[in-house]
């Protein structure tokens, strides 16, 4: 059963990436990035659609060449999710993807040319209502900043960010968000904390180059978890050397764990011991795969015995407490007369969860209709 998060979020300005609101209390958006060749339109479209299926809010696509810009046009026509074009050095690419309907430009104004070229890009973004993301990375700081600080520090990352922010300020452009990513958790956290005190624009969170699926997820959960718990962050990406779909799943899991944004099922499951009366691990793993399409927020507890089972079930949307041959079943914290056969637990629970999700979705639609009236 859903509980409100105690987190008080940092106040920020509002921008829109396509139809997705960012900042000013909007739901924290989960982003990912394609890792296909952008010029391989079919592969890139297929990957974006796989990200759409797991609920991604925004997808970033690298556009390093004019050929990639032409491919971007075709990609944009075939997907629904807002797209961010990641561009460095060549301002003409930014102008071209703007013409093709890009939803956001990820650029650093200071590395796309002289003042006139920067002005052209910013004027184009303003005319087409396209926001910009300033993206600073601890591994690619400007040479003079590297020489000044000797190594990446929070002050160095923020100085780099403010250098780009000042360029946009001088051009009277305020539709932007900023990131100050680093692969070191403490460096990233301290950089975001410092930046959050200096600007009002939305912040895009990430631990860059976090690592593989396991280590990268842990590192990102620690770093982003700290910042999010302090109310810092308006959008995020989990950077993994893995399938981008995993980035989205981990992102939603972090938000779900902090009760910031719930999407889909929050499984509460015991690590198991010799007291378990059915295969808890197998049941949870199978249900996670079968129920990936469920986006209705709900807590489902699956506990193998009666030690902690009843207590967890009483605070869950649906719950199972292990018993010999047939286990106890709870709905909305209330124990039901019906018991679930352990030998058919997975199929029975899947049916129960899908029925509950449909009912909750129906109630939500009724409430929305009542509000409209």
Curated annotation (Swiss-Prot):
SUPFAM superfamilies assigned to the protein according to its UniProt record, in alphabetical order: Dihydropteroate synthetase-like, Nitrite and sulphite reductase 4Fe-4S domain-like
Its EC number(s): 1.17.7.3
Co-factor: note: Binds 1 [4Fe-4S] cluster.
Obligatory cofactor(s): [4Fe-4S] cluster
PANTHER family recorded: 4-HYDROXY-3-METHYLBUT-2-EN-1-YL DIPHOSPHATE SYNTHASE, 4-HYDROXY-3-METHYLBUT-2-EN-1-YL DIPHOSPHATE SYNTHASE (FERREDOXIN), CHLOROPLASTIC
HAMAP family (alphabetical): IspG (MF_00159)
Protein name (record): 4-hydroxy-3-methylbut-2-en-1-yl diphosphate synthase (flavodoxin)
Lineage: Bacteria, Pseudomonadati, Pseudomonadota, Gammaproteobacteria, Enterobacterales
